[in-house]
A protein has these predicted regions:
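Class I SAM-dependent transferase core
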Residues: 52-87
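Conserved SAM-dependent methyltransferase scaffold
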Residues: 115-116
Length: 275
């Protein structure tokens, strides 16, 4: 057994026997990888430069005005501050903000861009934010405090289908970005409340091949399905960017996603959604 197989064997064993420990180990490893990538691509210096020229808040998009932190978890910070982050989803998010949800659940919340953003825009709606990464939970709580949302946003660790089923009440929205774990989590057979919930999930076929087809087959009978594919950003759409160098402007709105990255929005069919 070579070193790669040994590492895979240990990882699989940890995920099976001690998923929380495995999650912490995996998150720490991913953070180290991202730090090296950011330094190599010039993103570390770009972030410093951005923070000296712009306010520490979201400049545009559905969560414009939200106060932010000077760090992020396993994703680029500057696109979130610019307001270009996951711009492909802005139309869906705008619709979601008008949908009358009674609960929002964010699994894989990181520092809380979506959890706190939805809480800010839906002040009477409870938001549950889950992440296995200790640093993510700390930052999500800190951002909730920064925006005076601490009584509205509940931050917790691991979320399994049983826990998800408990927190889904009324007309709920589930936001899911958990690096392939969505295949384990989004199980209507184990969480029947998913049949009445709307679900916005980032798909990770590059981690678990076939996951898109699996999830679509689970929700096809109860939900209308919309697939959204990632596209490149045009910095000209964000006039608030103060960088003069065109290369820096492009870098500021880049998210470095895998080719053909997709999201799925599962909207509960009329008559199936909770009242």
């Amino acid at each position: 057994m070579n070193n790669h197989h040994v590492k895979q064997f240990i990882k699989q064993g940890l995920m099976r026997l001690a998923p929380e420990v495995a999650g912490v180990w995996q998150s720490a490893r991913e953070r180290r990888h991202i730090r090296r990538f950011e330094q190599r691509m010039g993103l570390t210096e770009l972030k410093r430069s951005y923070l000296t020229q712009h306010e520490l808040s979201v400049a545009s998009g559905p969560f414009a005005g939200m106060k932010y932190l000077s760090e992020s978890v396993c994703s680029a910070l500057v696109p979130k501050l610019v307001g270009s982050y996951e711009a492909e989803l802005h139309e869906i998010i705008a619709q979601a903000l008008e949908a009358g949800y009674t609960t929002v659940v964010d699994v894989g919340c990181a520092e809380g861009y979506y959890a706190n953003g939805f809480a800010l825009r839906l002040p009477s709606v409870p938001v549950y934010a889950f992440d296995i990464d200790v640093q993510a939970r700390r930052l999500c709580s800190a951002m909730a405090n920064l925006n005076d949302l601490q009584d509205q946003v509940t931050v917790a660790g691991r979320c399994d289908p049983e826990r998800l089923n408990v927190v889904l009440t009324g007309h709920s929205l589930v936001i899911c970005d958990c690096e392939g774990y969505e295949e384990n989590l989004l199980r209507p057979d184990l969480a029947p409340a998913l049949a009445q919930a709307d679900v916005l999930v980032e798909l990770h076929d590059h981690i678990r091949p076939g996951i898109s087809a699996t999830l679509q087959s689970r929700f096809r009978d109860t939900h209308d399905i919309t697939l959204v594919t990632a596209i490149d950003r045009d910095p000209a759409c964000y006039p608030g960017l103060l960088f003069s160098d065109p290369a820096d402007r492009r870098l500021a709105v880049s998210e470095f996603r895998p080719a053909h990255q997709q999201w799925a929005f599962f909207r509960a069919k009329t008559g199936n959604a909770a009242a």
